Amino acid sequence: MEKNIPKHIAIIMDGNGRWAKKRGLARSFGHMEGAKTLRKALEYLTEIGVKYLTVYAFSTENWNRPQDEVSTLMKLFLKYIKNERKNMMKNKIRFFVSGRKNNVPEKLQKEIEKLEEETKNNDKITLNIAFNYGSRAEIVDAVNRIIKDGKENITEEDFSKYLYNDFPDPDLVIRTSGEMRISNFLLWQIAYSELYITDVLWPDFDEKEIDKAIESYNQRERRFGGVKNV
């Protein structure tokens, strides 16, 4: 039977620190390995026909981590943007960042905006990176913009237009490392997404693990709150 490939996959990339700790390495090594895994995952998902990939890279709560780790993550993201620019243009990957811009280093924010502009017409796959992102913050920001615009009698469709992007809702949400929680990720958008949780740590999440997640997705019956006709 032919596989049904999700149009939009969202991933909570968890376990970088634990991956490094198991090997007696600093947490920063886990984050660097996680960046390599993201590149491989993006290539494979593009190959099999996924159109949107949203990844949870840095939450609004992650500012509470040790300062040296936060600094490492900022530098790593800047390096990732610079290193992947040519690859994204070559493979027609659109780059987009969802999240608040406050606190993000100015140099990093400029590089984000530059790559978003350069890749805005790429249409093979969209890589949406949730960075300095929290879903409650996104909802609050949307409400404040609605109030500012003086809107009344807002529908769900109207509300969605005030979120950080207009991408379709995720079909499948994957969380690595075995944690059984959403962690303030896409609370509005994943109302009817299928969830897949694996004990595999993010740096070890390879093509075979992606296939397992999609196989599990294909075994689900998506009813969106309804019932199957008998």
UniProtKB/Swiss-Prot annotation:
Keywords from the named record: Magnesium, Metal-binding, Transferase
CDD domains documented for this protein: Cis_IPPS
Name the UniProt record assigns to this protein: Isoprenyl transferase
Top EC class, one word:
transferase
Q: How is the cofactor bound?
A: Binds 2 magnesium ions per subunit.
User: So what EC number does this one have?
Assistant: 2.5.1.-
List the coiled-coil residues.
Answer: none
Reported function: Catalyzes the condensation of isopentenyl diphosphate (IPP) with allylic pyrophosphates generating different type of terpenoids.
For this UniProt entry, the molecular function terms from Gene Ontology, in alphabetical order, are:
magnesium ion binding; prenyltransferase activity
Q: List the disulfide bonds.
A: none
What is the name of the gene encoding this protein? uppS
NCBIfam families on file:
PRK14830.1 (NF011405), uppS (TIGR00055)
Positions with a binding annotation for Mg(2+): D14, E194
Q: Where is the active site?
A: D14, N62
Q: Name one GO biological process term.
A: polyprenol biosynthetic process
Q: Does the keyword Magnesium apply?
A: yes
Positions bound to substrate: 15-19, 27, 31, 59-61, 63, 65, 175, 181-183
